[in-house]
Amino acid sequence: MNSRDSAASEITPEVLLRAYACGIFPMAESADDPSLFWVEPELRGVIPLTGFRVSSRLARTVRSDAFTVTVNQAFTAVMDGCAEPQPGREDTWINRRIRELYSGLYALGHCHSVECWQDGDLVGGLYGVSLGRAFFGESMFHRARDASKVALVHLVARLIAGGFELLDTQYVTEHLKTFGAVEIPRRRYTGLLEKALTGPAANFTRLSIDQPISGTEALAIIAERH
C-alpha cells in the first residue's frame, strides 16, 4: 500500500508510532519534496536475529575495534550522514519532515542511533525505531570502509542482549542479504510484528550506552543466539 499524505505536518511522532505498530512507515520522494507517503510492502525485509551472518573478514574488522562505537551520542549527525549521497544511492528520501519526525521519536526514547568514529570523526552509523520487541532499521551510511557494517553488528548484539525479537529492514538489498536478510510475505510479517508488540517491551539500553562493548563482546553475544 502506498498512499500519499499531502499534509505531512499532520503526522506527529505519536501517529508515527501507531503506524509502525500497524506495519506502515513513511517515505518521501526526495529531500526536496515536502510531502510524505505511507508504505506497506507486499514483501517485507527482515534479518532473523538467530540467523545474523558476519563474514570472516568483517569479524576480523569488528574484533580489531578499528572504530570507536557509541550509541545515541550523535543522532542528528547520523541522520545527516544517512541523507548524504552514497555509492548506488545518489538521491535521498530523508526530507525536512522526516528529520523532524524521527528527531521527535528520539526525544521520546523510541529512536536510536549507533555511531562509528575514527580519529574523532564520525565515519559511519545507522538509526532506527524501537517499539515493543521490534526494531525498525531506517537508514545507514559510511564514510570509511566497513563503518556501517560494524555499526550493524553492534546494533544486532544490542538487540539480542535487550530481548528484541524482530529486526525489520523494510526492504532487502544485496548488501543486507550478506547479513542474512530475507523477504517474507506481508501476512507472515504481520504475525511476527504482532508477537513482538505483545507483552513486555525490550530494553535497547540494557547494554550500557556510557561504556560501549568491544567488538569481541558484540560477536560473542551474537554467537550465543545462534
Swiss-Prot record:
It catalyses: N-terminal L-lysyl-[protein] + L-leucyl-tRNA(Leu) = N-terminal L-leucyl-L-lysyl-[protein] + tRNA(Leu) + H(+); N-terminal L-arginyl-[protein] + L-leucyl-tRNA(Leu) = N-terminal L-leucyl-L-arginyl-[protein] + tRNA(Leu) + H(+); L-phenylalanyl-tRNA(Phe) + an N-terminal L-alpha-aminoacyl-[protein] = an N-terminal L-phenylalanyl-L-alpha-aminoacyl-[protein] + tRNA(Phe). It is found in: Cytoplasm. Its EC number is 2.3.2.6. GO terms for cellular component: cytoplasm. It is an enzyme of class 2 (transferase). Functions in the N-end rule pathway of protein degradation where it conjugates Leu, Phe and, less efficiently, Met from aminoacyl-tRNAs to the N-termini of proteins containing an N-terminal arginine or lysine. Belongs to the L/F-transferase family. This is Leucyl/phenylalanyl-tRNA--protein transferase. It comes from Bradyrhizobium sp. (strain BTAi1 / ATCC BAA-1182).
